[in-house]
A protein has these predicted regions:
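Conserved beta-strand edge residues that scaffold enzyme active sites
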Residues: 50, 72, 101, 128-129, ...
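Active-site nucleotide/adenylate-binding loops and adjacent lid/helix of ATP-dependent enzymes
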Residues: 1-14, 58-63, 102-188, 196-198
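Short glycine-rich anion-binding loops that position phosphate/pyrophosphate groups of nucleotides
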Residues: 15-17, 71-73, 144-146, 291
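Conserved N-proximal alpha/beta basic substrate-recognition cap immediately N-terminal to
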Residues: 17, 21-22, 26-124
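A short glycine-rich, hydrophobically flanked beta-strand micro-motif that places a catalytic Asp/Glu
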Residues: 48, 178-182, 189-190, 266-280
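ATP-dependent carboxylate activation and anion-phosphoryl transfer catalytic cores
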Residues: 244-352
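Phosphate-binding site of ATP-dependent enzymes
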Residues: 160-256, 284
Length: 352
């Protein structure tokens, strides 16, 4: 009698302990591993740095899909595309966005160039060389590569005439390259998207509220708001759903623009686009997030839940999206029919 072993879906990350935004990847890996086991997969967590040995050992087990949570190696975000490139060379399916999309979104200024060329509204910006904005324009100084609000606090909102000085100070303090974009005073929304059997599904957009913020405190999602659980910002920036009912026109605009970003960057698997909305109700795309945080209590997971997608269903859908990128004939020949089996698991997961 032949006993079929479970399909192997390892989880790969390169996070290091020490920073809350790094610990986020470790928490995601733990939650996803537990969920994959409950869905019937074999899974473990593979931590990597610049040594390829763990990846080589993982490949010996012939993974069905690699669940990619790598957003950098040894805290160097420039190495985020390393694992996708390695897996693409070996023709191994992996979750989330592909190598080329990750590279395109790694630099915020490069992302803004792409969005501007595609006709997607994004705030004007200043780099470290030129300053085309009037000096009294409010701008937000932020990292070109960090996607966790690293280096952003209340003092990041300044006049354009002060931007170059603040950019140089931030670069000296945090390293890397900083720039400044026009600060859109108004509301903030996150729009999450996940691949489905017939294409991308744009999930309900939550608004980030700035509850009880004093007039002199910039209404921004800074580092404290994301990671410092005891801070005023963290405790006073809840998310609120329902924009599709309270302002259907704005809800449609946000979803349409998010889908345009998905197509422009060639996003796959799952992604998130952050928006500011000005006083006239115009959305501005400010950040493109490939493979955003998907811990069980993360904003992305809460958004999926609002759309009726449970956490196990979300994880299964991300796995299935990776499989769909592989030629069906090749999958059938090598693996049988994991796509159909996955559809059954998704149905079962709804009751879990």
């Amino acid at each position: 009698m032949t006993v079929l072993r479970p399909f192997y879906v390892p989880i790969v990350h390169g996070a290091m302990d020490g920073r809350p935004d790094e610990a986020d990847s470790i928490e995601s890996a733990d939650a996803i591993c537990e969920t994959l086991h409950r869905l019937g997969y074999a899974s473990d967590i593979v931590h990597i740095d610049l040594d390829l040995t763990p990846l080589e050992r993982m490949m010996e087990r012939e993974p069905l899909v690699v669940f990619n949570l790598v957003d950098g190696l040894r805290a160097d975000l420039r190495l985020q595309p390393f694992v996708p490139a390695f897996l693409e060379k070996l023709r191994v399916p992996y979750t989330g966005c592909r190598f080329d999309a990750i590279v395109a979104a790694m630099s915020k200024t490069r992302s803004k160039h792409l969005m501007k060329a595609a006709g997607i509204a994004t705030p004007a910006w200043i780099d470290g060389i030129r300053n085309p904005l009037p000096g009294d324009t409010l701008v937000l100084v932020k990292s070109d590569s960090e996607h966790a609000s690293v280096g952003i606090d209340a003092t990041s909102v300044v006049m354009a005439c002060e931007a170059q000085k603040v950019i140089r100070h931030r670069e000296a303090t945090f390293g890397g390259r900083f720039f400044a974009e026009v600060f859109i005073e108004g509301r903030e929304f996150n729009v999450a998207m996940v691949d489905g059997p017939i294409g991308v599904e744009v999930l309900p957009p939550p608004e980030i509220l700035f509850a009880g913020y004093p007039d002199d405190k910039p209404k921004i999602v800074d580092y404290d708001a994301k990671w410092q659980t005891e801070s005023f910002a963290y405790q006073n920036t809840p998310r609120q759903f329902g924009i599709e009912k309270t302002d259907p026109k704005l809800g449609r605009k946000l979803k349409k623009m998010a889908a345009e970003v998905w197509n422009t960057f060639g996003l796959t698997g799952y992604a998130r686009v952050d928006f500011r909305v000005d006083a006239m109700g115009k959305p501005w795309a400010i950040d493109v997030n490939t493979n955003p945080c998907i811990t069980a209590d993360a904003g992305f997971s809460a958004t999926a839940s609002e759309a009726g997608i449970s956490y196990p269903q979300l994880i299964e859908r991300i796995v299935q999206a990776a499989l769909r990128r592989t030629a069906p004939a090749e999958l059938d020949e090598v693996l049988g029919d994991p796509l159909r089996a996955g559809e059954a698991r998704v149905g079962e997961a709804g009751a879990w």
